[in-house]
Design a protein with these regions (language model features):
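Phosphate-binding loop that captures ATP/GTP phosphates
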Residues: 1-52
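Cytosolic-facing regulatory segments adjacent to core modules
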Residues: 35-47, 55-96
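Conserved beta-strand segments of the P-loop GTPase G domain that flank and frequently precede/overlap
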Residues: 55-56, 88-90, 111-117, 143-148
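P-loop/Walker A phosphate-binding loop and immediately adjacent motor/lid segment at beta-alpha junctions
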Residues: 67-73, 126-152, 187-190
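Well-ordered beta-strand positions
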Residues: 86, 110, 164-167
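Inter-motif core of Ras-like GTPase G domains
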Residues: 98-118
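Beta-strand-loop-alpha "switch" segments that mediate conformational coupling across diverse proteins
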Residues: 146-190
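NTP-binding/hydrolysis catalytic cores, primarily Walker-type P-loop NTPases
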Residues: 181-210
Length: 210
């Protein structure tokens, strides 16, 4: 979880669902990242034996720990790939100043690029697409997805901006409720979420082969 401005952990799950809260900042503050340091600071999700997370804690920010460099970010990602079969980095949209997100985008085997159907997303893409088209970001490995599509929104308009779109993720009221309740990792059980679940399963097959 790369976001150091708005740490995602508080809206992903309840504190009681985490075995022990540890901080990403403790890893990146080290002069060199080691496998043992990563394992020591992983947070295990009690409701899924196959999921562990690394991220900033509630109340922490970019100034809580000493600044880190590209080397620490690269070491973290390389070692994480040796520890776990799949490593997902939740990148921020501010790749110009977020070192971890920038390194993750460059080193990733596959990048899933999400865009909404609103004017803010269009403004962001107009500003940032020239940066993302640079050869160092390897546009060929970027899968494009239009996300949180509501009935009144035209995803086809976003395709005109993005080019070919691999996935179209519909809005789910159940997911929105989980976000508001801080339970985004919870199971989805409502009928209205079926289309959402199918698209997530499609992404899982395409990216991870599972």
């Amino acid at each position: 979880l790369a976001d150091m401005i708005t740490p995602p952990l508080p809206y992903l799950c309840a504190p009681s669902d985490i075995e022990q809260e540890r901080s990403l900042g403790s890893i990146l503050a080290a002069s060199h990242v080691t496998e043992n340091l990563i394992k020591k600071n992983c947070m295990f999700y009690r409701k899924n034996d196959y999921l562990s997370m690394v991220g900033m804690l509630k109340g922490e920010n970019v100034f809580t720990y000493p600044p880190y460099e590209k080397e620490q970010a690269a070491e973290l990602l390389q070692l994480a790939a040796q520890i776990a079969p799949y490593v997902i980095v939740d990148c921020t949209s501010n790749i110009a100043s977020d070192i971890l997100s920038a390194v993750a985008l460059m080193e990733a085997d596959t990048v899933l690029r999400l865009a909404g159907c609103d004017l803010k997303s269009i403004s962001y893409l107009s500003s940032q697409l020239p940066l993302l088209s640079d050869h160092k970001w390897d546009a060929d490995k970027q899968l494009k997805a239009v996300s949180n599509i509501r009935q009144q929104e035209a995803s086809s308009h976003m395709e005109q901006i993005l080019g070919s779109v691999s996935f179209q993720i519909p809005h789910s009221s159940e997911v929105e409720a989980q976000f508001l309740e801080g339970e985004l990792l919870g199971e989805l059980g409502l009928k209205e979420s079926r289309t959402f679940r199918r698209e997530i399963e499609k992404i899982s097959r395409e990216v991870f082969g599972v």
